Amino acid sequence: MIDIKLIRQNPDFVKEALRKRGEDPAIIDEILKIDADWRATITKTNELRSRRNEISKNVARLKKEGKNAEAEALIEEGKRLGEEIKALEEKEKELQKKLNDLLLMIPNIPHESVPVGEDESQNVEVRRWGEPREFDFTPLAHWDLGPAWGLMDFSRASKLSGSRFTVMYGKLARLERALINFMLDVHTKEHGYTEVWVPHLVKRETITITGQLPKFEEELYLAERDDLFLIPTAEVPLAALHSGEILEEKELPKKYVSYTPCYRREAGSYGKDVRGMIRQHQFDKVELVWVTTPERSFEDLEELVKDAETILRKLELPYRVVSLCTGDLGFTSAKTYDIEVWLPSYNAYKEISSCSNVTDFQARRGNMRYRRRSDGKLEYVHTLNGSGIAVGRALVAILENYQQPDGSVRVPEVLVPYTGFEVIP
């Protein structure tokens, strides 16, 4: 949620930010209109309360003086004021809800360093690492390799759950588990993250804090009986962990890592990446979340990206880093880097991690603040998030980039201590 003061003081700046994102800026005028009405209602209510308090004092005085008729007249006026105040209080609540509902629909303001563009075609490549492998044979896609070994089963997954699910057996199931443990070990032992085990079901308030609600409810799985949402990413419980809290500056930054399955309806992705494991309703991910100060959050974002890159470098998978343009930014993000791994089946780089600074956007929704060391003043924290990395896509990248002419796949050296084997199948 962006600061209402920013909209009041600089509406043209906010409108321009929305235009850069490809959003309609008309909502800002609607917000300003409701905000003006809301503040005028508060002013009127306070004036009437003041008058009612004055009447109460005068009634007591008049009764002491024996002026009962005058006192009764004021009592009647006080009753009328009470009814007016009650009506204004109801109006104030309604206007505040309308205002809040509209504010929840406004995306974050892009940082000045974000390239301006309409869509992903205008994202800017920042760097590359490694070279795509040149095969001296025709490489197979992961959706051909896995089933050929009898270790990846899409048909039984469909029988169990429908489309966009996968069953894996034996060495592939162990490779998935090995990747999870490897990533957690790197981030906790080398990068200084605290591992957190989080709930996979969260309250509506929690997932509103992190920005998935109210705008993207159709993308989420909802357990209606208890009004709990399956998490689309561990970012949700991690970023909301300190909601309603005041942290001390000396505690920051906090660096959290969590492995969870992630659940997404992918309602808007019909027809995209329909084969294989690239776009699933359920997938594994290791997530990185920082809670930090405004002064250092963009510097911290660069470090978070490098932490995610380390995983791909250790796996020796070629990748590139791109800075998302304004038109491709996620709803909550002020700045995002995508890390894309090379997949031979697509002959292209595909996203395997998205790392974002959401500034104080989630902190305002969740009232997450810290006390400054210098003067004791309370300020909103900044939160960052990033995949460190998507496990299923890492498995896919290994299968496709490490395959051999005989149809087998060599396991990356760093994973062998975790798998206990060097070749699949």
Swiss-Prot record:
Localization of this protein: Cytoplasm
Substrates-to-products reaction catalysed: tRNA(Ser) + L-serine + ATP = L-seryl-tRNA(Ser) + AMP + diphosphate + H(+); tRNA(Sec) + L-serine + ATP = L-seryl-tRNA(Sec) + AMP + diphosphate + H(+)
InterPro entries linked: aa-tRNA-synt_IIb (IPR002314), aa-tRNA-synth_II (IPR006195), aa-tRNA-synth_II/BPL/LPL (IPR045864), Ser-tRNA-ligase_type_1 (IPR002317), Ser-tRNA-synth_1_N (IPR015866), SerRS_1_N_sf (IPR042103), SerRS_core (IPR033729), tRNA-bd_arm (IPR010978)
Keyword ATP-binding included in the entry's annotation: yes
Enzyme's top EC category: ligase
Residues binding L-serine: T233, A234, E235, E287, S387
Pathway listed: Aminoacyl-tRNA biosynthesis; selenocysteinyl-tRNA(Sec) biosynthesis; L-seryl-tRNA(Sec) from L-serine and tRNA(Sec): step 1/1
This protein's GO CC annotations: cytoplasm
GO molecular function: ATP binding; serine-tRNA ligase activity
Binding-site list for ATP: R264, R265, E266, E351, I352, S353, S354
EC number: 6.1.1.11
Keywords: Aminoacyl-tRNA synthetase, ATP-binding, Cytoplasm, Ligase, Nucleotide-binding, Protein biosynthesis
Domain notes from UniProt: Consists of two distinct domains, a catalytic core and a N-terminal extension that is involved in tRNA binding.
Subunit details: Homodimer. The tRNA molecule binds across the dimer.
Primary role: Catalyzes the attachment of serine to tRNA(Ser). Is also able to aminoacylate tRNA(Sec) with serine, to form the misacylated tRNA L-seryl-tRNA(Sec), which will be further converted into selenocysteinyl-tRNA(Sec).
Designated name of the protein: Serine--tRNA ligase
Organism: Thermotoga maritima (strain ATCC 43589 / DSM 3109 / JCM 10099 / NBRC 100826 / MSB8)
Source species taxonomy: Bacteria, Thermotogati, Thermotogota, Thermotogae, Thermotogales
